[in-house]
Design a protein with these regions (language model features):
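Metzincin-family zinc-dependent endopeptidase catalytic domain
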Residues: 1-65, 90-94, 104-107
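Catalytic Zn2+-binding segment of zinc metalloproteases
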Residues: 62-78
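Conserved catalytic/binding loops enriched for acidic/polar residues
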Residues: 75-183
Length: 183
């Protein structure tokens, strides 16, 4: 990213797309969703499915350009039995953050009747909260110290009401926290 040092405004962003990403997402989907989606069992995916796979990876990368870090801890807030609940997965997704490496809902079984939308990661509760926290003007504070205290109070209140907003990157903080496994 290229930022304006005076305001922090993002002026320009770059997303690197490696030559093998298409093969990588194909293989991830085949292995992790092959029992749930017959289309995942093919050696060549139709353009619609490949487009969904590209949008999933692109959403994660755009999150980085907006300043979001990996959030490997968010998935630890989802009870495992909820991953097999069609109503839960359709309402909340299988991970609270597209910034996790949760990939696909491979816990779901064919008898759970979870459609493709419930298998794919999507922008979740944590991602929306992180963008709001970082970009939405929320306070009448005129200095960084006051703003900091107001943000801390708001964060504590939000986490109390929604544990899916929990953050743990497993990289710069909580490196020994089992809830923040990377892969």
């Amino acid at each position: 990213n290229v930022h304006d040092p005076r305001s922090g405004e993002i002026i320009e962003s770059h997303i690197c797309w490696y030559h093998n990403v298409m093969t990588l997402v194909h293989d991830w989907y085949m292995i992790q969703a092959g029992t749930l989606d017959e289309a995942a069992q093919k050696m060549k995916y139709d353009p619609e499915l490949m487009g969904q796979l590209i949008r999933f990876v692109s959403s994660h990368e755009v999150g980085h350009t907006l300043g979001l870090r990996h959030n490997f801890g968010s998935s630890s807030t989802v009870p495992v039995d909820s991953l097999r609940s069609r109503s839960f997965v359709m309402a909340h997704g299988h991970t609270p953050s597209i910034m996790d490496y949760a990939r696909f809902n491979y816990v779901a079984q064919p008898e759970d009747n979870i459609p493709r939308e419930g298998i794919f990661p999507r922008i979740g509760d944590y991602d929306c909260w992180a963008i709001e926290w970082g970009y939405k003007p929320m306070f009448n504070a005129y200095d960084d110290v006051s703003d900091h205290f107001e943000l801390e109070a708001l964060t504590s209140a939000r986490l109390k009401d929604n544990r899916r907003l929990w953050f743990g990157d497993g990289e710069t903080n909580r490196t020994n926290d089992a809830r923040c496994q990377t892969e």
